Design a protein with these regions (language model features):
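Extended alpha-helical targeting/anchoring segments
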Residues: 1-211
Length: 211
């Protein structure tokens, strides 16, 4: 599975790691390399990823020291058991006088599960989805209690399974942009949830774990 870092702060160093752009893993190394290159060169995936990186930089900028926001890496292909993603890393230095709650307020919800512009995107999501997401796309993590150091590590509640009243459930989704294709978005959702189906011995043969 590939849970995403929502925001991390260690001794005043902030980090976001946007994930946007997905392909399944290949059945062998040759297919895996082909799918990685397809992902890396897809204009739709590139545009979506750059938009979310910019949003992440803006979010960190709200609580960062002026001039400290830095894009450490951009659009690397990162491989997981069933899928590969385009990933980036944005860092910054926390501004004096800011605390962990300021960091959470500036970054939650992350743009990769809300969209941009963030407030308007959330309004559209609420009108279209018709029900609460509950834990899905929220955040899970910890906040340090040291008054002399701001430390936190929050992950996005995706690729996660929940138990309620004896029932297991999970959710998966994809970012919808102007150039999205409904069939491809559905395939992405299936690929993202493959690990959950495999855990429950319901894995599909066409989405194998890469070995």
């Amino acid at each position: 599975a590939s849970p995403e870092v929502m925001v991390r702060c260690e001794k005043g160093r902030l980090q976001l790691s946007p994930i946007a752009g997905t392909r399944r893993r290949g059945r062998d190394d040759l297919e895996d390399a082909r799918l990685a290159e397809e992902l890396r060169s897809d204009p739709k995936e590139q545009a979506e990823h750059v938009m979310l990186v910019d949003l992440g930089r803006n979010d960190l900028g709200r609580v960062a020291q002026p001039g400290s926001v830095n894009l450490e890496r951009c659009m690397d292909v990162e491989r997981f058991s069933h899928v590969m993603h385009l990933t980036s890393r944005v860092t910054a230095r926390l501004a004096p006088g800011r605390d962990a709650l300021d960091v959470l307020a500036a970054t939650f919800p992350t743009g990769t599960v809300s969209g941009a512009p963030k407030v308007r995107a959330m309004e559209i999501i609420r009108s279209l989805e018709g029900r609460a997401r509950r834990p899905y796309a929220g955040c899970i993590g910890w906040l340090g209690l040291d008054k002399d150091s701001v430390d936190l590590d929050m992950g996005i509640a995706i690729r996660s399974m929940w138990s309620r009243e004896g029932h297991l459930f999970w959710q998966a989704g994809g970012g919808i942009v102007h150039d999205s294709d409904a069939a491809l978005e559905w395939k992405e959702v299936c690929n993202k949830s493959a690990i959950m189906r495999l855990v429950l011995e319901e894995g599909d043969d066409h989405v194998p774990a890469h070995r």
